[in-house]
Design a protein with these regions (language model features):
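Ribonuclease/tRNase effector modules and their secretory precursors
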Residues: 1-95
């Protein structure tokens, strides 16, 4: 899968760095998302766990070419959103 990242114009670095997220963590979530749903304006939202156990929300847009996407941002789930995600995952596992 070809993954491109939005780069912060001020630094030239991937925007995800502003949220202390690495490219590898984003790839972990995108390869095995716990949830993947429609976002705004054609974007998609993937929620999932990294190999080391962090739960992330990744906002991305599928590219026109197959097996390619553009990551806008990603950040760690905390508080109520994290609790709700874990609850949904437990319920999904009980089915």
């Amino acid at each position: 899968m070809d993954i491109r990242f939005y780069r912060d114009p001020a630094t030239g670095e991937p925007h995800i760095y502003n949220h202390s997220v690495t490219e590898e963590e984003v790839e972990d979530v995108l390869r095995r998302p716990g949830e993947d749903r429609l976002g705004r304006e054609g974007a998609r939202i993937a929620l999932g766990q990294t190999r080391v156990g962090r739960c992330l929300r990744v906002i991305y847009v599928p590219d026109p070419e197959p097996e390619s996407l553009f990551v806008i941002t990603a950040y760690e789930l905390r508080g109520k959103p994290l609790t709700a995600y874990r609850r949904r995952q437990r319920r999904k596992g009980q089915r």
